[in-house]
Regions:
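Active-site/ligand-binding-proximal alpha/beta "capping" segment
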Residues: 184-217
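Single conserved hydrophobic/aromatic residue that forms the stacking wall/gate
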Residues: 1-9, 13, 260-264
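His/Asp/Glu-rich mid-to-C-terminal helical/loop segments that flank catalytic regions of hydrolases
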Residues: 248-263
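A C-terminal functional module that forms or caps the active site or interfaces directly
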Residues: 205-247
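Generic non-transmembrane alpha-helical segments
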Residues: 23, 27, 173, 177-187
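Residue-level detector of anion-binding/catalytic polar loops
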Residues: 84, 116-117, 188, 217, ...
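Metabolite-binding pocket within alpha/beta catalytic cores that recognizes anionic/polar moieties
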Residues: 10, 14-166
Length: 264
């Protein structure tokens, strides 16, 4: 009985995802191939999308809504360069009280919209002492210290396998393209491992030391669930952190106030 209930719940999740995607597909003239998830203070990138369509999260059936300052709460679909894209201007966080299937809900909607590549951004605290506030970091891998995983429970076979491979969670080909673009544009780009904590408290100095010992270069409260679900769904993913501050214990400074300003 318990298994039957879990299976029914997963079917309901699948149906809710499809309803959200169908709502957009019926109205949009685009079939986006690239998804963008824009983190704290980074949503202004969506303003560069041309001939854009806007879908407020509150208007999309079954979509959660963001409660975080600096997150607009809408999908922007249009053209960026010569590519059709869909951008999340504002993401959902585990610490807001959402289950991880809701945090990652938009990624699966993107999959049904036709997205095959995903670019994820976030604001993060630097753990690596050779980094500086304001640096950009290309994510090479992640460590999940959130205490949970969005794939817990019955697998939704329509999206991916029960045990997805995470050996290249951040696609090497896409990472190399980002490195090439940064070099051409003369943008300093660090590389490192992103460590997710659940939040909403910032990490303690002891937790930051632990993250550093375990091989982390930056810490934050997002990204990992979306990347896991994207990989499960067969979406190639690349991630970039804007290092808005040095993590706790590295410098003696307050943490949240400069995030949006530095990101912009």
């Amino acid at each position: 009985l318990h298994k039957a209930i879990r299976r029914q719940r997963q079917m309901c999740i699948r149906d809710r995802i499809k309803a959200s995607a169908d709502f957009i597909l019926k109205q949009s003239k685009y079939k986006p191939e690239i998804g963008l998830i824009l983190g704290s203070g980074l949503g202004s990138l969506a303003d560069a999308i041309e001939d854009a369509e806007y879908y407020n999260y509150a208007d999309i059936p079954n979509f959660p809504t963001s409660t975080v300052e600096g997150h607009a709460g809408r999908l922007v679909i249009g053209k960026l360069g010569n590519k059709q894209v869909v951008a999340m201007q504002g993401r959902f966080h585990y610490y807001e009280g959402y289950s991880l299937d809701k945090v990652t809900f938009p990624v699966r909607v993107m999959k049904l919209l036709g997205v095959s590549k995903l670019i994820v951004t976030n604001a993060a605290g630097a753990v690596n002492e050779s980094f500086n506030a304001g640096d950009l970091m290309l994510i090479t891998d992640h460590i999940n210290f959130s205490g949970s995983n969005p794939l817990f429970g019955h697998n939704i076979d329509e999206f991916g396998p029960r045990f997805p491979d995470m050996s290249e969670a951040y696609n090497l080909e896409l990472r190399n393209k980002v490195l090439e673009a940064a070099k051409e544009l003369e943008i300093k780009l660090q590389q490192g491992v992103y460590v997710m904590f659940s939040g909403p408290t910032y990490e303690t100095p002891a937790e930051v030391r632990f993250a550093r010992i375990m091989g982390g270069d930056a810490v934050g409260m997002s990204t990992v669930p979306e990347v896991i679900v994207a990989n499960h769904s067969g979406i190639k993913t690349v991630g970039i952190s804007c290092l808005t501050n040095m993590a706790a214990g590295i410098l003696n400074q307050p943490l949240h106030l400069p995030l949006i300003h530095i990101s912009e």
